[in-house]
């Protein structure tokens, strides 16, 4: 049996190396971003050692798990036995925190994690699609709905934007759990990928009716972190216009493509909207859920 203990910041480099190794083994490339890992750990604060664990064998780090307030679980392990030991700790802690469920996202090619969750009583719930849109073709101009104006994010907009996101996501996902506002603001804005000029806010008569939040372009790629439209504005082309506005903005900054992730079961029609806008799926992630 591996040694399981609480995670500390001294483990950071070894955990990132493990995540990178497991990603490359499953996908042939790495989709691990150390800065994202760092920000998730920072949000845990003093609870990191209680809500996150590492597995060690002969002094080598061979597994890691992170329990988040959103009732999501991150898991990486060299084999399913190590994964099971970490999962047992995570489930026990989740029950202590009165979580209603645990959700874990993994690619089908990650054999140790998929075997762990299947054996651990998780059910495959739905898929997340990763999609990309090339920007080297003719880009249509955005057509804004009558009466809607668009501007970049300002320092005083955080609470309104956060509320719009939470309302939109909770409106169709009964399991959605938002972050505390201070945690959300820290995760979203206090890092190098944040650029307020890439956060587009759509308003009607001063009311926020849509937003599209993007990360700064990296190595020629842009990223749509969040895009939502208030239910009162859906069906008028605002989502498409926000995307097209982003295409032109990214292209003007030299990006060659833009990507996003979307829940395949999103009932607002988002996956179909993205396909019509030129996005193509290149990776699928399964969401596994266990009710506690």
Set out the residue ranges of the language-model regions.
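Conserved acetyl-CoA-binding loop-helix of GNAT-fold acetyltransferases
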Residues: 80-93, 226-229, 235-252, 257, ...
């Amino acid at each position: 049996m591996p040694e399981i203990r609480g995670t500390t910041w001294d483990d950071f480099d070894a955990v990132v190396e493990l995540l990178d190794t497991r990603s490359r083994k499953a996908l042939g490339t790495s989709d691990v971003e150390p800065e994202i890992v760092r920000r998730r750990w920072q949000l845990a604060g003093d609870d990191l050692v209680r809500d996150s664990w590492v597995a060690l064998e002969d002094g080598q780090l061979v597994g890691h798990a992170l329990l988040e307030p959103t009732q999501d679980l991150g898991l990486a392990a060299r084999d399913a036995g190590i994964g099971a030991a970490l999962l047992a700790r995570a489930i026990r802690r989740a029950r202590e925190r009165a979580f209603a469920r645990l959700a874990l996202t993994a690619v089908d090619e990650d054999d140790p994690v998929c075997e762990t969750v299947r054996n651990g009583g998780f059910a495959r719930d739905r898929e997340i699609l990763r999609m990309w849109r090339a920007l080297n073709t003719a880009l249509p101009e955005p057509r804004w709905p009558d009466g809607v104006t668009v501007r970049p994010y300002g320092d005083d907009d955080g609470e309104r934007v956060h509320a719009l996101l939470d309302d939109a996501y909770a409106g169709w996902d009964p399991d959605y759990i938002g972050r505390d506002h201070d945690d959300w603001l820290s995760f979203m804005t206090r890092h190098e990928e944040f650029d307020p000029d890439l956060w587009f806010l759509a308003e009607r008569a001063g009311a926020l009716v849509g937003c599209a939040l993007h990360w700064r372009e990296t190595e020629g790629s842009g990223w749509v972190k969040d895009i939502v439209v208030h239910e009162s504005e859906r069906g008028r082309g605002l989502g498409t216009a926000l995307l097209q506005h982003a295409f032109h903005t990214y292209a003007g900054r030299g990006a060659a493509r833009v990507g996003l992730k979307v829940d395949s079961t999103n009932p607002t029609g988002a996956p179909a909207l993205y396909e019509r806008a030129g996005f193509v799926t290149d990776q699928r992630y399964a969401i596994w859920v266990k009710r506690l």
